[in-house]
Design a protein with these regions (language model features):
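Extracellular secretome segments
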Residues: 20, 64-68, 192
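Solvent-exposed N-terminal domain segments of exported/luminal and surface proteins
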Residues: 50-57, 65-75, 81-87
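Ubiquitous "structural anchor" signal
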Residues: 29, 41, 70-72, 131
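A membrane-pore/channel beta-structure motif
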Residues: 44, 58-59, 67, 249
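Extended charged/polar low-complexity repeat regions
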Residues: 3-6, 18, 39, 53, ...
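Short, intrinsically disordered N-terminal pre-domain segments
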Residues: 1-13
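N-terminal-proximal low-complexity accessory segments that begin disordered
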Residues: 20-41
Length: 962
């Protein structure tokens, strides 16, 4: 989380490590106060619990030994466990030494009735990830939940390791095999030791040597080695070499033979490493480089060379904590592994963005029975240094699953982020619940509430500012990844929009295949999606539990005309009836044909991967022709269009045939490029009567002007002229339209923008002749770039739009529209919506007061299948109410066909005023019968879809009216 100060890189909550060159590393265990020197040789594979072979200098054993570092705690060393306390490293649960658990993988939980005030206190083991130790006839077995087993003899000596795949690593006095072909052999001779690892071509030699006549030295060398068929060393080359001096059977000095670094131990005890020096072998000291002393509960580490110095100081008391000049780490008094408190200086942590989008690594989570965190301290920011504080309260909030909550403060220069960490005691952090307290005056805390355990997730913050640099609103997006399969969502993208004291949430949830399965916008409407094993959508649902639209898709394999096909069936609900549409795919899962709810079958035909024809119910409706893979001709219902090309661009569009004499349509559309410096593009549109329109564009594709030439004339007359403001400030101020001159209307429109040219705030209209002003239109916007007011002067006309939550909501739907004429309120319209954002009520009054209501419109929508809450977006009924009258004064009901076309509008209060509509197979209106006015109209179309005839009939006599 953030970049930790480099001075803390070598500080671990458990140990401070100092490299001793190739000789190995010095490990100072902060919880035990023991300092030891070790050199790792190799880790054999073949098990989830690998054999880590190390050379370890042990004063108790009087020298160097090959070490596996497997420790067992004796029964006599274990204090009696009491309810409410943490257990020691190893706990014997039954007193018979039959079952034991390693603390690092398990813990005892003490619950104080977090969920039930009447429950009694109790303690128990939570062993989901435990290591179990069992006594056998020959010794002990250590087994994890995966089935990996380590066997020890009665003295605690490791004998073998068997993994879940049946591979066994056996250990004898001279040979270690891992069951997969890797062999390690070692032998002692003449006070030394030789280790060979054939699988890695490595050989280690630990031999007593004499240096400058001085005894007590050992040489440790590592070689790249090869062996012959008899097992003898064929050749070897040294890669590492170090020398160790023993005095009184204790380690006194370590010398790295390659880097000339020597480490000297004080009082011949490996628990006190006094200094580490640069020197030549056998020569005098050439420069002090590193010292470490341990006295009176304080450790001082000093680093010095010829160019710079650095001092780190550590202090501890009762093994509870380590205090450094860079930070503080404190551990629980009952167990040194349990983090209690930490304060660490970090660089660049959680900087709040300024007009830019940045990623801040924060996280969120959920832990059952959180409890209450109290009495924590907020740190101040000094010199803009961010500080990370952890306050770990182990007693107040630990749930029955062993999860413990810590408070986590992240302070930046603009925000305070409060986070709660959930972790298994003595192990790693697994989740966080986060609050961000904005410094913006009046702002509410940003809150992300988790629902499962999470890994770290970045939070992306975007600050939207107005032209004056003031924050209008902020969005915070967190991406949460579930690596463990705990939830059905592999990825969650959650965005909070914060404005003032309002907060709105939108989200998108993805499954493990990264298919979108759930989403919700700021309007609160939720959408859900389901898929089959092949990733094809099987259903979608939009809306709330009481009002939603649902469509089901079925994708299955069938046989049609002896051919294997796949059918994708869409089932939806209209007018209380189930309707279905189909897409049928061939064996390659390429679209074969579609079938709508009325049974009309549309079939695409391809040749050389190009669409050549579209047929409806076997009749060709559209055909396509190509040259060099470019479309040159399109025929639709008998009307043919042709396309011409210039140098790589579409140059002309025209009709090859004209099927109608009733319409003056464009016959050709030609694009040409001029040779002027700005590369203006000119487009000519010509109709059948010779009328030509000429459009001119600049090199950026912006329309500069429109001219027309009437039939029989030779010159063009200007119709429209546009001018633009060019971009400034490196594009921060974009190019925008400045003026429009409409020569036909004799008017000029001039646009005024805010200083960032984001919005047009004023439109001034003048006469082109004389320049007299006609009117000025003023426009205002809210923080979400929506128009809120339009006025032409307070004495003329104004329109004010209000959105939910007094314009603090990002929703696009209107909540109120107010009209004012000549300074007097003309109307005030309010809107209400259901869970699908469908308009349910429209109230019109003279003011916002309910007493000023003039009339009200109410809307109802069609339900779906019988007995369900499924709903469509089709209006079923519209009712009109007058003020103070409970009965509707107007009631209209709508009916639709299977394609959603309105077929009848019924006047429920006067059935003699109904209106009906009829359509052809292409959903074109062919007849309109209006009994309210006693008229009927019939429409005829050409093959291009143009109305060629409109005839009027008397619906009572069916006679055509002349």
């Amino acid at each position: 989380m953030g970049t930790i100060n480099k001075k803390l890189k070598d500080i671990s909550p458990i140990a401070v490590e100092a490299e001793a060159g190739n000789a190995g590393r010095v490990v100072y265990d902060l919880k035990t106060g023991v300092l030891k020197l070790e050199k790792e040789l190799v880790s054999l594979p073949g098990s989830k619990m690998p054999l880590n072979l190390k050379l370890y200098y042990d004063v108790t054993h009087g020298g160097w030994r090959l070490n596996y570092e497997q420790y067992l705690t004796q029964k006599s060393q274990i204090a009696e466990w009491e309810s409410g306390t943490d257990k020691p490293d190893v706990i014997y649960t039954d007193g018979k030494m039959e079952d034991r658990y390693f603390y690092a993988a398990n813990q005892v939980v003490h619950e104080s009735s977090l969920s039930d005030a009447d429950a009694s206190d109790y303690g128990y083991f939570e062993n989901e990830t435990c290591l179990n130790i069992k006594q056998t006839s020959t010794g002990w077995e250590l087994e994890d939940l995966s089935g990996n087993v380590m066997s020890f003899d009665g003295n605690g000596k490791l004998c073998s390791v068997e993994n879940v795949y049946g591979h066994t690593s056996s250990v004898t006095s001279g040979t270690i095999t891992d069951g997969e072909g890797n062999v390690c052999t070692f032998e002692r001779s003449n006070g030394g030791m030789t280790v060979e690892i054939r699988g890695y071509n490595k050989r280690f030699e630990l031999l007593p040597v004499t240096v400058s006549g001085s005894s007590g030295w050992y040489m440790l060398a590592e070689y790249k080695a090869e062996w012959d068929s008899s097992g003898a060393v064929l050749q070897k080359s040294c890669t590492d070499r170090s020398f160790y001096r023993l005095q009184n059977n204790s380690l006194a000095c370590v010398f790295d033979g390659f880097t000339s670094v020597e480490a000297t131990y004080s009082n011949n005890k490996p628990s006190v490493l006094e200094k580490k020096e640069y020197r030549d072998y056998g020569a005098s000291v050439s420069g002090e480089i590193w010292t470490l002393s341990l006295a009176n509960g304080e450790t001082t580490e000093k680093y010095t060379d010829f160019t710079h110095t650095a001092d780190n100081r550590y202090s501890y008391k009762d093994r509870k904590g380590i205090k450094t000049e860079y930070g503080l780490v404190r551990y629980d008094s009952n167990h040194p592994d349990l983090l209690k408190y930490a304060s660490i200086t970090v660089d660049g942590l959680c900087k709040a963005p300024d007009r830019t989008v940045t990623s801040n690594y924060l996280v969120e989570s959920y832990v059952p029975n959180l409890g209450t965190v109290t009495d924590f301290t907020t740190i101040s920011v000094e010199d803009e240094i961010e500080r990370m504080n952890i306050n770990y309260d182990t007693s107040a909030i630990t749930n029955k699953n062993g999860l413990t909550i810590a408070m986590f403060n992240l302070l930046s220069s603009q925000e305070l982020l409060n986070m709660f960490l959930g972790m298994k005691k003595g192990t790693r952090i697994i989740s966080v619940y986060m609050n961000a307290f904005c410094y913006d005056e009046g702002a509410m805390p940003l809150k992300f509430r988790g629902y499962e355990l999470k890994n770290l997730a970045p939070v992306v913050c975007t600050d939207f500012r107005d032209e004056d640099g003031n924050s209008r609103y902020k969005t915070y997006t967190v991406y949460q990844v579930d690596f463990f399969g705990i939830t059905p969502y592999a990825l969650k993208e959650t965005t909070q929009l914060v404005k003032g004291n309002k907060r709105y949430v939108s989200y998108k949830y993805y499954n493990s295949k990264f298919e979108l399965v759930k989403e919700k916008g700021y309007d609160g409407v939720e959408k859900q999606y389901t898929y089959d094993a092949d990733g094809l959508m099987t259903g979608e649902r939009v809306g709330s539990d009481t009002a939603y639209v649902k469509t089901d898709y079925a994708f299955e394999q069938k046989t049609e005309a002896g051919e294997k096909v796949y059918e994708e069936k869409s089932t939806f609900y209209v007018d209380g009836q189930e309707r279905s549409a189909r897409n049928v795919y061939d064996g390659k899962k390429e679209l074969k044909y579609t079938e709508d709810a009325k049974g009309n079958k549309t079939t695409p035909v391809f040749a050389n991967d190009l669409l050549t024809s579209i047929k409806v119910n076997g009749t060709e409706k559209t055909s396509y022709e190509y040259e060099n893979n470019r479309l040159t001709k399109l025929t639709h219902n008998g009307t043919k269009f042709r396309f011409g090309y210039g140098l790589g661009y579409l140059g002309s569009i025209g009709y090859e045939t004209l099927n109608s004499l009733y319409n003056k349509r464009i016959e050709s559309n030609t694009l040409t490029l001029s040779s002027t410096d700005d590369e203006k593009t000119v487009q000519y549109d010509t109709d059948v009567n010779g009328y030509v329109e000429r459009y001119t564009y600049d090199k950026n594709g912006r329309l500069l002007g429109k001219k027309e030439k009437k039939a029989g004339t030779s010159s063009y007359a200007s119709v429209i002229e546009n001018t633009y403001l060019e971009a400034e400030d490196g594009g921060l101020k974009p190019s925008v339209l400045e003026e429009i001159v409409d020569n036909k209307a004799g008017l000029k429109y001039t646009y005024t923008y805010d200083k960032n040219r984001k919005h047009a705030t004023k439109v001034t209209v003048t006469n082109t002749a004389g320049g007299a002003q006609k009117y000025v239109k003023n426009i205002s916007y809210d923080g979400y770039d929506r128009v809120t007011t339009e006025n032409y002067g307070s004495a003329i006309y104004s329109r004010t739009v209000s959105y939910p939550d007094s314009n603090d909501s990002p929703q696009e739907r209107f909540e109120r529209v107010k009209h004012t004429v000549n300074g007097i309120s003309a109307s005030n319209t309010t809107y209400e919506y259901d869970g699908l954002n469908r308009l349910t009520k429209e109230k019109v009054g003279k003011s916002s007061s309910s007493s000023s209501l003039v009339f009200e419109n109410r809307y109802e929508y069609y339900a779906g299948k019988s007995g369900t809450n499924e709903t469509t977006g089709l209006v079923r009924k519209e009712e009109y109410y007058l003020k103070n009258i409970t009965a509707p004064q107007g009631s209209i009901e709508y009916e639709y066909d299977a394609n959603g076309n309105v077929t009848e509008i019924k006047n429920l209060l006067d059935t003699g005023k109904n209106v009906s509509y009829e359509y052809d197979s292409l959903n074109r209106l062919t007849k309109e019968t209006n009994f309210a006015i006693g008229n009927e109209w019939r429409y005829t179309y050409d093959n291009g879809g143009n109305i060629t005839k409109k005839e009027e009939y008397n619906p009572a006599t069916y006679c055509r009216r002349q």
